[in-house]
Amino acid sequence: MSAFFAERALLPSGWANNVRLEVNADGVLTHIQADSHADGAERLSGPLLPGMPNLHSHAFQRAMAGLAEVAGNPNDSFWTWRDLMYRLVGKISPDQLGVIARQLYIEMLKAGYTSVAEFHYVHHDNNGQPYADPAELALRISQAASSAGIGLTLLPVLYSHAGFGGQAPNEGQRRFINSTENYLKLQSRLQPILAQQPAQSLGLCFHSLRAVTPQQISEVLAASDKQCPVHIHIAEQQKEVDDCLSWSGRRPLQWLYENTEVDQRWCLVHATHANPEEVTLMAKSRAIAGLCLTTEANLGDGIFPAVDFLAQGGRMGIGSDSHVSLSVVEELRWLEYGQRLRDQRRNRLYGANQPMVGRTLYDAALDGGAQALGQAIGALEVGKRADWLVLDGNDPYLATASGDGILNRWLFAGGDRQVRDVLVNGQWVVRDGRHAGEEESNRAFTQVLRDLLG
């Protein structure tokens, strides 16, 4: 058992002072007591917060962050960005993927993300053929997460088609494509391996309605664990909505709700172009809206109607997706700022009994992220995994703030530099802003970039 003492900590009931926390050998919180003592405990150096789950990641895309910011096409969009992504993914080896993912996860930890849902759809070799072990690349992701020390929900993706109605895949998608049968075999191969890994679990994932058929969705759901998370990209771009209407006469979210039992297991990634009726369906189903603000802005996707969704009790979380940014602060700040820009008003996302915008944003992302990852995380609470971050207690903004003002100061006037220490599964992974493996990881990652882009 390890004991820790925080002068200020954000508990489910709110901010508390002089909090003693005890963690067992399995990395689980076993005791939390406010107004307690520090006897025999490690003193934490600043405000203590639950670690943030990152509910949407494509690890390999970190290698191309910043490469698509070159003007030239007046109609530049997600679809033109995708062409660059296809060219990059065609080159990456298993070793390179492992290096990229480890670097990414270290950077996430330093920003305050303590777990990640990896939406993993690169399955095959550069020619589109399965590896000797079809789980080769998925296992590289698991190994990278273990090496970095981040929690992981691995989401192997079923990706079979290039468009609605079962269109044949194109050459750029050759590394992604699986049949339903092979996808279920991949799940079976990974399940016992991840079950032995601390802080790792497995979920289901459909790339999008355009990449799978209705029959495939039904078959996978029928053959799988009824408790595990289910993730899908949906309604990210207007073109996707238009194409779905042409195929089915229904919008993507409308089609999904009419043809599938969507419940709290589901994470609807992006859902950018949800209309009012679909927003209501999402909120009532208690599915998670997986919002990736910096990526959606980078791709020019649009703005999710978060004010209306939150007002109806909707649940949401954040993800860094293409990793143009790896900042908890940026994702939450732009979740709020996007609504302000759309509505031309300030302070848009807050609760009926919670006027502090920072607290509303942080709580929503904790709860939604934990639900989307399907793990016992997202709160400093007995029985949950000991995942947390310690902010810099010497920072002037934080040292002079109290209660929920700490979150407002951090999220709207601060940044990643204020994340001092990070603990995952009861183990320190970042101390004084540094990860023990970052120097070696930086060197390896630099070489991979030179090899891929040179």
Predicted regions and their residues:
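N-terminal metal-binding scaffold of metallo-dependent hydrolase/deaminase domains
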Residues: 1-37, 47-48
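Metal-coordinating catalytic core of metallo-dependent amide/deamination hydrolases
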Residues: 124-271
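Active-site gating loops and adjacent loop-to-helix segments of metal-dependent hydrolytic enzymes
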Residues: 63-99, 125-134, 161-181, 238-263, ...
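Divalent metal-coordination and catalytic microenvironments
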Residues: 7, 27, 56, 112, ...
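His/Asp/Glu-enriched, well-ordered alpha-helical/loop segment
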Residues: 258-261, 265, 307-394
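Active-site microenvironment of metallo-dependent hydrolases
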Residues: 1-19, 359-454
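Alpha-helical scaffold segments that flank or form the walls of functional sites
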Residues: 66-151, 181-197, 442, 446-454
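Histidine-centered catalytic micro-motifs
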Residues: 50-62, 229-238
